[in-house]
């Protein structure tokens, strides 16, 4: 997709929710998956870059997303919101089920072009964040790391926090790193540039 202008990002809707590949959309539209731990701000990221308030439901209860949620964007692109990981109150068996569902999608979906891996800029990446990044690198899936909640940190400390995140992830310079805030609307254009470069 050469130009951002050809994509009407406001023309977006939730298409379907799927538990396994038999429920995935059956076409060749490119897909960008969004992964991150519970309450990292995935729903806010989706709503902010699409300019919509409640397209993806934000929840005060972590672990709310239990299926792969496919969002149709102008019939040209899809976002796929995968269940948030690292939520302790979900049973081990439930976490294992989610893990299998996520792994099946990430490793077998031909439509997948890249993964937006969301981390919290305020904190060093969790064990699960690092495992997700390593998993994506192992399978040679392009990664866009989006560090959320930048508005919670003084601007002058962003570089320091970015360095902490990158070091913990063993960040590959061929990937993209974006500082993002849905509150201050920071990183929207950079996110679209990185996404459209992959599709």
UniProtKB/Swiss-Prot annotation:
Its cofactor is Mg(2+). It holds the Pfam family MMR_HSR1. GO terms for molecular function: GTP binding; metal ion binding. Signal peptide: none annotated. InterPro entries: G_ENGB_dom, GTP-bd, GTP-bd_ribosome_bio_YsxC, P-loop_NTPase, Small_GTP-bd. SUPFAM superfamilies: P-loop containing nucleoside triphosphate hydrolases (SSF52540). GTP binds at residues 36-43, 63-67, 81-84, 148-151, 180-182. Transmembrane segments: none annotated. Mg(2+) binds at residues 43, 65. The keyword Metal-binding applies. PANTHER family: ENGB-TYPE G DOMAIN-CONTAINING PROTEIN (PTHR11649:SF13), MSS1/TRME-RELATED GTP-BINDING PROTEIN (PTHR11649). Necessary for normal cell division and for the maintenance of normal septation. This is Probable GTP-binding protein EngB. The gene is engB.
């Amino acid at each position: 997709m050469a130009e951002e202008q050809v994509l009407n990002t406001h023309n977006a809707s939730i298409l379907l929710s799927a538990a396994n590949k038999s429920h995935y959309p059956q076409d060749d539209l490119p897909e960008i998956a969004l992964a991150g731990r519970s309450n990292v701000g995935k729903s806010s990221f989706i709503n902010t870059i699409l300019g919509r308030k409640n397209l993806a439901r934000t929840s005060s209860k972590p672990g709310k997303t239990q299926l792969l949620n496919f969002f149709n964007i102008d019939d040209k692109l899809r976002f796929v919101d995968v269940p948030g990981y690292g939520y302790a109150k979900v049973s081990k068996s439930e976490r294992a089920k989610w893990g299998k569902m996520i792994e099946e999608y990430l490793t077998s979906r031909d439509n997948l072009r890249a993964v937006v891996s969301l981390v919290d800029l305020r904190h060093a990446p969790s064990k699960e964040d690092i495992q997700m990044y390593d998993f994506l690198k192992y399978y040679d899936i392009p990664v866009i790391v989006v560090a959320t909640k930048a508005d919670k940190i003084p601007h002058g400390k962003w570089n320091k926090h970015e360095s902490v995140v990158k070091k913990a992830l063993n960040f590959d310079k061929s990937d993209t790193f974006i500082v993002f805030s849905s509150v201050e609307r920071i990183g929207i254009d950079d996110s679209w540039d990185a996404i459209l470069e992959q599709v």
